[in-house]
Amino acid sequence: MLKIIPNKKDIGAEIVCDLKKLSKVDFRRIKSALHKYGVIFFKKQNLTSSSYINFAKNFGKLANYPRLKGLSKKYPQITVVQRKSSDKGPSFGEQFHTDSIYTKKPPRFTMLLSKLVPKKGAANTEFCSQYLAFRNLPINIKKKLELVKGIYSSEGPISITTKERVKEKGKKIKELISTHKIFKKINLNYAIYCSPGHFMDFKPKIKHQLRLKKFLLKHQIKKKFQYSLEWEKNQLAIWDNRSMLHQATPFKGNRIMHRITIH
């Protein structure tokens, strides 16, 4: 029987079930929990690539990630995020961000399935609730941000963390730039939709925009909005890119994750 266990402050939830044996009612509950908590995770899920793909399709159309090659010709939508103990420099995604916001149609959801992880407590993924960030935003700041969009680039601050991985297993692409509204309405709730790792500027330009930019990017990642996920082998996490920021944490060791993004 499916069981939902919310984390403190309702930032994320663990769901206890077997992903290979789900009813239609179970799927509805999982989707509802994802919208409510922003990120959900499932332990002890020994999924094949085929079953992983089939599960992901329940959430929408699978996307192709523009910066890394797929797992294989059969599974191009699964990208491998790997770090070796010999790797130097920052981990892939080691700055708060939301995935592929620099595209015209960014993915709504991201899935990560752990295949190989270092010791417990290392290589966590940190999440930051943008529902809470929006609720705690001063009214005068909300009014200013309602009038502008954010400009985002694939060559933003976080791009330094992708260069080594792209060099190894990726493909060169031209800089991608897109603009999006700062706020998103998801069901009945609002969230800040701004990726610190890709943010370049506001459009149109506004008075005191540098000060506003610094305030916004600092506000979004306050500790009181955060949850740190400890990975175990064969653990699956799904998060809503519209309501959650995430980042990798620094670590040494070997890790292999299989990633899917969904429109």
Give the location of each predicted region.
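Non-heme Fe(II) oxygenase catalytic core, chiefly the N-lobe of the double-stranded beta-helix
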Residues: 2-233, 242-263
